[in-house]
Each structure stands twice: as C-alpha cells, then as structure tokens.
A protein has these predicted regions:
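Non-catalytic, mostly N-terminal accessory regions of nucleic-acid modification and defense proteins
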Residues: 1-208, 267, 271-280, 373-376, ...
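Conserved Class I SAM-dependent methyltransferase catalytic core
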Residues: 19, 32-48, 252, 270, ...
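Active-site catalytic pocket residues across diverse enzymes, especially alpha/beta-hydrolases
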Residues: 53, 230-234, 334
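C-terminal, active-site-flanking charged/polar segments
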Residues: 66, 367-368, 378-443
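Hydrophobic alpha-helical scaffolding
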Residues: 140, 162, 216, 244-248, ...
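Conserved S-adenosyl-L-methionine
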Residues: 187-291, 296-300, 305-313, 325, ...
Length: 535
C-alpha cells in the first residue's frame, strides 16, 4: 500500500525566525547579538520593500493592459516603469535593491549584493539615509552557504501571508529581544513597547491629525499604532506629521526602517542623539506626544543642563533618575493651548520624595490630567507594573474630536487596571498578559466620559477601578499620585458570613478526620494480616 504524502508544513513566522536565529548562532563571524539582529532586520526590510515593489509593478502592468498597452514593450517600460511613483509608500527600487535580484544571486556573491542594495537605497531616497550600517554583510564575511540559508528562510516571509497591517519588523525585533535579550536592557534603549499598550495610549489621547512627537521613539511603534488608529477611522495618515528622536543608534535605524516600510514620512533627525543634551526639535511644539522612555534612567544629567529652560517654574530633576526630566521635556514640547501627552513611567515616579516639589508644581498648574496604573507582566523585559501619565494643556473644556469637554482644572482622574490580568499570552517562556480590544475601549471610555460635559467629577468613581479626585485631597496626601491612596478598596472580608463559613470548615475537618481514622484502621488490619500487629 502506498504511503500517504506528509502534509505540507504550514509556514509560521515564529518557526521561520527560529530557523534564522539558529542559522545565525551557528554561523561563523556572525558577530554580537546586536550585529545578528541588524543583519536579520535588514534582510526582513529588504524582503518587504521588495515584495511591495513587485506588487506595485504588477498593479501597474494590469493598469497598462486595461488601457491596451503592452507592459513588455521596451518603450512602454521606459515611459512608465523607470520613474513610477507609488502612492502607498512603495519604493521604486533600483535593480540592485530588488528582492528578485538578491534571491537569485549565487551564494558566493550574496554579501556584496546585499551591501550594494543598501548603498543604492540610501542614494535613491533621503528618508532612508542613516538606516543601515555600511558594510553590514561584507565586514562580517559570513560563509556563502550560511548567508544563503538565512536569505532563503527570509524569502518565506510574505506580507500577504502574515498580514499587511501587522508591524512585522516590530515582531521580528520583539522575537530577537526575547531570544537574545541577555544584553538587552531598557536603559540601553533595547526595548519594544507591546502593541496593546501603544493602542491604549493612542485610544485615550486620539492622535488623529497634526504633529505627533516621541522623544524616545524606539522602533517607532507609537507612530505605527497612531497611523493604524487613523486608518481604522477612515482618516488620512498624511495628516499626521511624525517627529521623533532616539538615542540608541541601532534602534534609531530600526525606527527609520519600520516607518519606511509603512510609507510614513517622518522627521527623526539626521542621526541618533539624546533628547536631553541635544534636543533635535528644540523650540517646536506638538499637538500630541506619545512615549515610553527608559525607566529610572541614570547618567542622563550634564552640568550644562542645570539652568535649562525646560525646568523653569517646576524645578531641577534629580541627576540620579531621569523620570521627571522626561516629564518636563515632554511638557516643554506640548502646544501651550491644547497639547496632550500620554507616556509611561515606572510607578516610583508617582510618589518619590525627591521629586515632590516638581510634582506639586505640575499638579497645581493643572498639567496632570490622568494617572493609569497598568497590570504587571505586560512587557517583555520586565514584569513590574508601570503607569500611564496623561498631561493636558487644556483642562478648561471646549470641543475635542467632536466631544464637548467640561472644565477639569481642579481634578485628576485615577485609574487602577492592575486586576486586568485575565488575558494571558500563550506560548511565552515567562508569564505575560495583554490588554484586549474590549479592555482598551473600556479604559478609553472611562477617561473620555470623565472629560465630557454632563459628568459630575465630584461623584465619578467605581471602587477598585477609578475615581476623580480634587486638588484639596491630593494636597492632603502630600501631592502623591499613587492611585491606591484615592480609589476605594472594598474589604471583601466584610461580606463573609463567618458563622456559616466556620460551620463549613468544621464539616470539612470532620470528613478529613473520619477518612484518616478509616485509613489508620485499614493499615492496622493489613499489618495484622501478615502477623505483625500494631499496638
């Protein structure tokens, strides 16, 4: 009887990345974690811009045929293909940078072909300058068979199969963080903000149009999710003007690649640099700011910053911790009339004693609008609970995205989402939870309802979830912004009928003791049966 053919293995992105990781680990001269990651991300980038180019050319050919023109005609190709402009962010790639050229290059020439592709891309498009390390592949001098195996594996990744709207470079970056994260710490900038956390921030501050800024932009995830939100509302992503800065060189390159893949125009500066000592967007004000800066960053301070204008009226942040330096930097870049910011910080920033004066000034000047404590274990490289801060330059009311807002000048909304841990992520090496769409929508609705006309801020509360709090109460608590000081906690022990509970426990203990006596008798009988009685 003939054997049945084995079922074809379903392509899985994680399986492909796992294979690439193993090939890179086994390859000689593959370099450090960061060099391995750079090579992998660059290959994925080339794969996806190449596939988008091929899709764009196919659509162009179809359009030409519909008009009775032959796409194979040399004159037609010269007229329509050489200078074709695509409106969806697709690059008109030079021949050397096309994936078909790369995948068909014999193994011995792949290292040179790949670096040539990167050089040509930077020559063709100013937005791609600074994306790549010169000699990424040739300086490593990977064996021909090693680089060929990796390229063939990357060739299996298709945006058609794995989803055009997913942050695929981000997913690859996230995968490599998890697999190679021995040296990847948040202080070094090697941090990837989970999609659900970015979606929560975007859902709350609604960055639909205008200037959007991230002073620690990482891999560009804040920008990507904002664009997704605009598309979901049938909006025009071109009405978002993206500005950002990133200190870490490798992460800066990743952000440029990530945004380029999405066709999102951006202003990330000519190079990577510190937002504190070399603010690339000094003097600019933004409608929206979204950020996940490094938690509790040390080494940020320079004596030249002592009298910096960003600290004026608030106080000098402690040199030992950058949390409040980030807050004041963000505030300095918000549009004075109506700018709004959502950003993440470690929970210690809510009540640190050495920042109490700055915190008091922020609260009294009406800059802090909401404090949201998030569940633990949302992040890849840390399991701590963190806080989402929302600053708003306009708490006096008005119209915002079609909603009539009331005056919240003397109030702050506190939310505690730490109990939202029921959605565990399957298949992770460590426990990890996520926020699902319904939870994100609920959190945003709580915040937006609190802002809106018709809500009584003095009586806006649900125990153990949220509460609107006035300035007087916050002052009585020493200007602490810790939600647990304000949100009511229900003592569930008070709901227990102790008499009934003790009767239940007593009954269970009787059953246990009866079973023990029965077991003891059976044991004694067994020993007697073999002639060894137990006195």
């Amino acid at each position: 009887m003939a054997k049945k053919k084995a079922a074809a293995k379903v392509l899985n992105l994680d399986n492909i990345l796992f294979n690439c990781r193993d090939y890179l680990r086994a390859a000689r001269n593959s370099g450090s974690f960061f060099e391995k990651r750079d090579m992998m991300l660059t290959l994925v980038f080339l794969r996806f811009i190449g596939e988008k180019y091929e899709d764009g050319i196919e659509k162009l050919c179809q359009t030409l045929r519909e008009r009775g023109l032959d796409p194979a005609d040399e004159n037609i190709r010269a007229a329509f293909f050489d200078d074709a402009t695509f409106t969806d962010g697709t690059y008109n790639l030079p021949p050397e940078a096309r994936w078909t050229t790369i995948i068909n290059t014999p193994a011995p020439g792949l290292n040179v072909a790949l670096d040539t592709a990167l050089v040509r891309l930077e020559e063709e498009d100013p937005q791609l300058r600074g994306c790549f390390i010169k000699g990424t592949f040739t300086t490593r001098n990977l064996a021909a068979n090693d680089i060929k195996k990796i390229v063939d594996e990357v060739n299996k990744i298709s945006h058609k199969q794995f989803g055009a709207e997913k942050d695929l470079i981000g997913r690859v970056y996230e995968y490599f963080l998890k697999e190679f994260a021995v040296n990847a710490t948040k202080e070094e900038g090697e941090f990837y903000t989970p999609h659900d956390v970015v979606q929560l921030i975007a859902a709350m501050i609604e960055p639909y149009e205008g200037r959007l800024y991230d002073p620690a932009c990482g891999s560009g995830g804040m920008f990507i999710q904002s664009a997704e939100l605009v598309r979901a509302r049938q909006g025009d992503v071109n009405r978002i003007n993206i500005y950002g800065q990133e200190k870490d060189a490798a992460t800066y390159r990743l952000a440029k690649m990530n945004l380029a893949l999405r066709g999102l125009s951006h202003h990330l500066g000519e190079t990577n640099d510190s937002s504190f000592t070399h603010d690339l967007h000094a003097g600019m004000h933004f409608h929206y700011i979204m950020a996940n800066p490094p938690f509790n960053l040390k080494g940020w301070y320079s004596p030249a910053l002592e009298h910096d204008a960003r600290w004026t009226d608030y106080g000098l942040p402690p040199a030992s911790n950058a949390n409040y330096a980030w807050i004041l930097h963000i505030l300095s870049h918000l549009k004075p009339a109506d700018g709004i910011a959502g950003f993440l910080l470690a929970n210690g920033a809510l009540s640190d004693s050495d920042t109490a004066e700055i915190r008091r000034n922020l609260i009294q000047k009406g800059k802090v609008e909401a404090i949201v404590v998030l569940p633990r274990e949302l992040f890849i490289t840390t399991d701590i609970s963190v806080t989402l801060w929302i600053l708003n330059q306009n708490k006096k009311g008005g119209v915002y995205h079609g909603r009539n807002l009331r005056d919240r000048t003397h109030e702050i909304l506190f939310m505690d989402l730490r109990a939202w841990t029921e959605n565990a992520v399957k298949g992770e090496n460590k426990k990890k939870v996520r926020l699902v769409a319904a939870q994100i929508e609920r959190a945003a609705a709580i915040y937006h309802t609190w802002q809106s006309v018709g809500t009584d801020g003095t009586d806006y509360a649900v125990p153990e979830l949220y509460r609107s709090v006035g300035m007087d109460e916050i002052e009585r608590n020493g200007w602490s912004l810790t939600p647990s000081k304000y949100i009511a906690f229900i003592d569930h022990d008070l709901e227990i009928d102790y008499a009934a509970e003790m009767a239940r426990i007593q009954g269970e203990m009787r059953d246990v003791m009866k079973q023990e006596k029965k077991s003891q008798r059976m044991l004694e009988d067994a020993f007697r049966g073999i002639g060894y009685g137990i006195d």
